[in-house]
């Protein structure tokens, strides 16, 4: 069940930044920094767009995703996730 919740949170986050076109900084496990906007994603990869070019990034290669602006995924107080 914990895996389902984690996947749901991941999909919720990625869908939110895709819809709002939030700029992201993505760090890969090898230290490479990528920047852009998510235009599409599935269970295994995401499509990152910047300056008219797209990059297909495999999720297993991603270490950290940092949005360029604060985001609010859930309504609620201290106990609400994120």
Curated annotation (Swiss-Prot):
Record domain Sm: where: 11-71
Keyword RNA-binding attached: yes
GO biological process: regulation of DNA-templated transcription; regulation of RNA stability; regulation of translation, ncRNA-mediated
One cellular-component annotation, GO: cytosol
UniProt-listed CDD domains: Hfq
Gene3D superfamilies: 2.30.30.100
Family as reported in the entry's similarity comment: Belongs to the Hfq family.
Record function comment: RNA chaperone that binds small regulatory RNA (sRNAs) and mRNAs to facilitate mRNA translational regulation in response to envelope stress, environmental stress and changes in metabolite concentrations. Also binds with high specificity to tRNAs.
Protein name listed in UniProt: RNA-binding protein Hfq
Originating species: Nitrobacter hamburgensis (strain DSM 10229 / NCIMB 13809 / X14)
Gene (UniProt): hfq
């Amino acid at each position: 069940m914990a895996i389902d919740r984690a996947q749901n949170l991941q999909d919720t986050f990625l869908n939110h930044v895709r819809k709002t076109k939030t700029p992201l900084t993505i760090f890969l496990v090898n230290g490479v920094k990528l920047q852009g906007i998510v235009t599409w994603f599935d269970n295994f990869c995401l499509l990152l767009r910047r300056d008219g070019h797209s990059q297909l990034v495999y999720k297993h290669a991603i270490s950290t995703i940092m949005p360029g602006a604060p985001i609010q995924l859930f309504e609620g107080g201290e106990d609400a996730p994120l």
